[in-house]
Amino acid sequence: MPLGTVRKVEALRHDFRSAAQLADMLGVSRSQVTRWLRGAGIDPLNAEKVDLLELVWSNLLRVYEREVALSWLFGINPHLGDRRPIDLVRGGRTEELMRAIRAERSDSFT
């Protein structure tokens, strides 16, 4: 069963250890994350960013430990044309991100 967006925000806040870090990753204000956690509605664009970050993060944790996964999110990635994955999360670039993760997974098993 899919998790609701608020539950994803709660889980991501826990994983990233603060609402401030989660807000930075999503490109929103910390107060916006706090409002979502208090039950304020989330607009479709930001809900998609939350969904994408949760998808990317859960896939990365299947391959890497937490700190390496964070480095992957914020590092320059050759599979993404030397762009940072977190910037593609903010831009909603699902296909490119999942392709890069698949490439990472295949590299890690060879």
Describe each model-derived feature in a short phrase:
Residues 1-110:
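Non-transmembrane "mature" sequence context
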